[in-house]
């Protein structure tokens, strides 16, 4: 409400939020920093604070948190339940049902088993598929695209290539207490691109796994340019020039301008940030 111009500063935000009935400040520390002083200065009613406290205490009582403050937290149970086969199967099914086929020209999908396929793009190997708010998710638990393909199909006639970095050289993204750094030289980028182009020339079909990094979506990530990263646009351009049978698998967490993608691909499959089993 400060950034949107409703309040001038953190103190005013504390007053207006409390008066509006917001009982808990989960993230900012604004209540902790200001409420006691504001009560002492007479800028906010102590009765109002007491009412908020009572609502919080009543909720905790209903949830049984006074008798068992840690509720279902159990390290042994967590090891048995988190990432168990049943949950991974559900995660895979949820991902599958979320995919959207945006284009399928000449019914190029599904791909025939006899096809020679080049899997190309930064998302062929990336495990960062969980989205911006998956705080305790660990990328090492994610099945990436190459692993998934090799687990399900005969890969004799397949090859796997990064084609480009996710964003380009000397890039740093920060968000949600995380950071992603990338540093590649122009020579390294050209070598990756050339390898992918050569593979595309030899393939019947190119599956191009491209999109935005997970930290490009979420809070405070507005961008004047909502196309796929420039270096991946270059990859799409070069690959589509040597092979007209391009299938794009698109990874992203927000709406994108896909006009360039759609014009150069025979099929486009939107898979979002598909999660652990995506």
Language-model features, listed with the residues they occupy:
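Flexible, acidic loop-helix segments that line cofactor/substrate-binding pockets
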Residues: 67-87
């Amino acid at each position: 409400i400060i950034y949107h111009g409703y309040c001038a500063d953190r103190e005013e935000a504390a007053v207006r939020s409390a008066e509006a009935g917001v009982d808990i400040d989960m993230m900012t520390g604004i209540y902790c920093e200001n409420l006691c002083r504001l009560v002492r200065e007479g800028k906010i009613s102590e009765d109002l604070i007491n009412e908020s406290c009572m609502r919080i205490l009543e909720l905790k009582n209903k949830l049984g948190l006074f008798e068992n403050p840690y509720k279902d937290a159990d390290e042994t149970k967590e090891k048995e339940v988190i990432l168990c086969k049943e949950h991974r199967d559900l995660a895979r099914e949820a991902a599958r049902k979320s995919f959207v086929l945006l284009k399928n020209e000449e019914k190029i999908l599904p791909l025939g088993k006899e096809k020679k396929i080049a899997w190309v793009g930064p998302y062929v190997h990336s495990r960062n598929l969980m989205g911006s708010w998956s705080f305790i998710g660990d990328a090492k638990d994610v099945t990436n695209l190459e692993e998934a393909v090799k687990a399900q199909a005969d890969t004799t006639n397949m090859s796997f290539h990064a084609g480009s970095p996710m964003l380009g050289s000397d890039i740093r993204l920060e968000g949600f207490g995380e950071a992603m750094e990338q540093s590649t030289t122009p020579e390294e980028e050209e070598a990756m691109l050339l390898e992918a182009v050569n593979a595309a020339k030899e393939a019947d079909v190119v599956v191009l796994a491209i999109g935005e990094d997970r930290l490009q979506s979420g809070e405070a990530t507005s961008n004047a340019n909502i196309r796929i990263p420039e270096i991946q646009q270059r990859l799409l351009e070069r690959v589509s020039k040597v092979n007209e049978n391009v299938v794009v698998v698109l990874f992203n967490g927000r709406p994108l301008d896909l006009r360039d993608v759609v014009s150069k691909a025979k099929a486009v499959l939107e898979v979002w940030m598909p999660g652990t089993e995506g």
